[in-house]
Regions:
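Acidic, Ser/Pro/Thr-rich low-complexity regulatory regions
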Residues: 1-107
Length: 107
């Protein structure tokens, strides 16, 4: 499916907000982890460093944008719970239907 210019533009506009929301959740998880008084500081430090190293590669944090991959990127973001299908309400029916079709195929 070729993505429309409108959907491509909307995806680029929305992605940063979706990523910001995802990272806000990560920061809260990190804060809860760091506030655990049962673990020594060194353990928390190294575990946090490992976690950040892994998380910074997550599509909820950073993505390479290619117009030809938008449908798959959206499906991936939904599967990873960065966004929900409802976040696509302003996109074209064609894009929404294609995403829905792919998600249903892989259940």
């Amino acid at each position: 499916m070729d993505i429309s210019k409108k959907d491509w533009k909307l995806f680029r506009e929305r992605l940063s907000g979706w990523q910001e929301n995802y990272m806000e959740g990560l920061v809260k998880e990190y804060a809860n982890f760091l506030n655990d008084d049962k673990k020594p500081a060194s353990e928390k430090f190294w575990e946090l460093e490992k976690r950040i190293k892994e998380d910074k590669r997550h599509p909820g944090v950073v993505m390479e944008l290619k117009k030809s991959e938008v449908i798959w990127d959206i499906v991936h973001l939904i599967r990873l719970k960065v966004i929900t299908y409802n976040d696509l309400s302003d996109f074209s029916d064609e894009l929404q239907n294609e995403v829905k079709r792919i998600l249903e195929m892989s259940r």
